[in-house]
Amino acid sequence: MTTEETKFQPKDYKSDQYVRWCPGCGDHAVLNCLHKAMAEVGVAPHNMAVISGIGCSSRLPYYMNTYGFHTIHGRGAAIATGVKTARPDLSVWLITGDGDCLAIGGNHFIHAVRRNIDLNIVLFNNKIYGLTKGQYSPTSDRGFVSKSSPYGTVEDPFIPAELALGARGNFFARTIDVDLKNTTEVLTASARHKGASVTEVLVNCVIFNDGIHKGIVDKEYLSLIHI
C-alpha cells in the first residue's frame, strides 16, 4: 500500500513520550485535536515538521510522532521559515504561546505572516507566562494582577487577529480548547490552506490563570470580548 493510499489514524501522530503538562491544562486538548486534524488531512507523519519556541505549549513537538524542533525563545517562526524554505514538501507547523510569539518573537511572527510562506502557526493564548510561574503577557488584559504586575498592568493587550491581519495575513481563525470539534475543524482548514495561516487557540492555565476565558465558555457570565 502506498503512502497516498494509507489511511492514517490520530494514534499514528502520537509519540511515546510522557506528556508533561499539568492535569487540566488546555494544551492537552489542542494536542489531541492536532492529532485528529492530521489524520483527517492525511499528511504522513514523516512529511510533517513541528517547530516550537519556549514555553509550556512549546513542548508539543515531543508529543508528535513527526519531525520536530524545540528551538529558542521567540525564534520559532524564523526557524520554521527556514525549514519550509529548505523542505517545501513538508507540512510545517509552528507551535507558540502568547509570550513566546508576541513579546520576544513578535518581529518574527509578523514577518512570517507578511511573507505568506506556507506555514501553519498555532498560537496558544492563555494570557500569562505559565512556564516562568505567572507573569503578565502581551495578551493580558489591562489591570491584570500578576507576579510582575502586583498593582495591575497599565498596558493594553495585543489582539492576535489585529496583528495577523495588519501584517496582511489571509487566514486567521480563533477557537477555544474546550470546543474540540471546532478546534479540529479549524486546524484541518489551516493545514489545507496554501500560505501562512494563524490559528489562535484560547487555552486555560489551571495553575496561574484559571478561568481567564470564562466569559466565552460560561453562558451565565457576562463579559465584553474583543477580537
Task: Give names to the regions the model predicted.
Residues 7, 11-72:
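Active-site diphosphate/adenylate-binding microenvironment
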Residues 17, 44-48, 86-92, 114-120, ...:
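Short coil/turn connectors at secondary-structure junctions
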Residues 21-23, 94-96, 171-176, 198:
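Short catalytic-loop micro-motif centered on adjacent basic/acidic residues
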Residues 54-56, 126-128, 179, 202-207:
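Glycine-rich beta-alpha junction loops
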Residues 56-130, 182:
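Thiamine diphosphate
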Residues 89, 137-192:
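Conserved thiamine diphosphate
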Residues 106-113, 131-144, 163:
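Active-site-proximal loop->helix
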Residues 225-227:
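Conserved small/polar residues in nucleotide/adenosyl-binding loops
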